[in-house]
A protein has these predicted regions:
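Walker A/P-loop
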Residues: 242-269
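Switch/connector loops and helix/strand junctions flanking conserved nucleotide-binding motifs
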Residues: 66, 115-121, 288-290, 314-324
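Accessory nucleic-acid engagement/destabilization modules that flank
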Residues: 2-216
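Inter-Walker segment of RecA-like/P-loop motor cores
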Residues: 300-347
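Conserved Walker A/P-loop ATP-binding site and its immediately adjacent core
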Residues: 275-299, 304-315
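Alpha-helical scaffold elements adjacent to nucleotide-binding pockets in ATP/GTP-utilizing enzyme cores
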Residues: 85-89, 107, 265, 290-298
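Pre-Walker A (Motif I) flank of P-loop NTPase domains
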Residues: 243-250, 275-277, 342-346
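Conserved pre-motif I regulatory segment
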Residues: 29, 217-251
Length: 347
């Protein structure tokens, strides 16, 4: 087990004048990021261990403790890279627990830059685990913490490092696909939570994915009656043939009501699987706007988020009727700055 109590105690003892961002105490940012990441994990239902996620969130910005970065936050001098130095702290925790978790290390190393191929990442960490490099990393950790007067309570034991290195060399390609998915989930949760906390988001705001209360229009002609029957038959067949997550197709002629049928089938599948969101993807911007209008009619304007290359920032969930006072809301800034999907339905 990783020494979570010791880490939490150490973080709580950091002086408040050690910042993550101007005026924001680093310890508060790390705890805030961890809390948001866990809330996102629970919402999305990804198969990522809460312990690993919290651990990497609590150390992901420790490289900012360096005196040069603190001076930069106060407008003095240039900043220095902090993501890679932050991985050194996580490496000590992994070695303390005899764990091999390159995905967590890489999530921190890449949370402000590009991702690296798995083979290259494993080569990088194999080199870092060499005895000479361990001594160099120990000195760098001490240098990073120098002005804080807070010695790091964990070390880089060579025996544990050798075991970690051996595992990398012998098992590097094991279950590559599932580990890649795990890495992408860890990275996504970390980056999203980190940005949210930096922008001032302290808790998640979201609407539930609720069934539409808009009934089908009353048939006034024979075509309307056919559409109603087609809607009923498609929904029944789709529900009966559903075998879990996968690819399903719906083929209907123009004018059959595919948009409404598609949304209702997607909602039925979401209810069967416990999904919290619908993502309705379309190939052309013109029909994205058209289908988004249908979705807003079905679910309400606040429950639908439009996302495409020509979209202008229009307040909460891109609602044209949004109050201008919402422009300073941290979550609204997150939505417009990073195109974060927060609404129950994204088109």
């Amino acid at each position: 087990m990783w020494p979570d109590a010791d880490l939490t105690s150490w973080l709580s003892s950091l002086p408040g004048d050690i910042w993550s961002h101007p005026g924001r105490p680093l310890a508060e940012h790390l705890e805030g990021t961890a809390a948001l990441a866990e809330a996102l994990r629970l919402r999305q239902g990804g198969e990522v261990e809460a312990r690993s996620l919290r651990r990497l969130c609590l150390v992901h910005d420790l490289g900012k403790i360096h005196r040069h970065f603190q001076a930069y936050l106060r407008g003095m001098g240039k900043g220095i890279p902090h993501a890679e130095p932050s991985t050194w702290f996580l490496l000590t925790l992994l070695l303390e627990g005899n764990e091999k978790d390159v995905s967590s290390l890489e999530a921190i190393r890449c949370h402000h830059t590009r991702t690296h191929p798995r083979e290259g990442a494993e080569t990088y960490w194999t080199n870092q685990l060499a005895s000479a490099n361990l001594r160099t990393l120990t000195r760098k950790i001490e240098e990073t913490l120098g002005h804080s007067s807070r010695p790091w309570p964990f070390s880089l034991p060579e025996k544990a490092a050798a075991a970690f290195k051996k595992k990398l060399l012998l098992e590097g390609g094991e279950d590559l696909e599932s580990e890649w998915l795990r890495y992408r989930m860890l990275l996504s949760l970390l980056v999203t939570a980190d940005r949210m906390d930096a922008l001032g988001v302290r808790s998640l705001e979201s609407l539930p994915l609720a069934p539409t209360t808009i009934p089908l229009p009353e048939p006034r002609r024979e075509l309307d009656q056919w559409r109603r029957e087609t809607h009923r038959d498609c929904l029944e067949q789709a529900t009966q043939t559903f075998k879990g997550p996968g690819i399903y197709s719906l083929s209907l002629p123009t004018g059959a009501g595919k948009t409404r049928i598609g949304f209702d089938i997607a909602l039925a599948y979401a209810q069967l699987t416990g999904a919290a969101n619908l993502v309705y993807a379309l190939p052309f911007i013109a029909i994205v706007e058209q289908n988004a209008a249908v979705a807003r009619e079905l679910y309400g304007p606040e429950a639908v988020q439009e996302d495409h290359s020509l979209l202008e920032a229009r307040g909460p969930y891109q609602n044209k009727n949004a109050d201008s006072e919402d422009e300073g809301n941290p979550l609204r800034r997150m939505l417009s700055s990073f195109r974060y999907w927060n609404a129950p339905v994204t088109v």
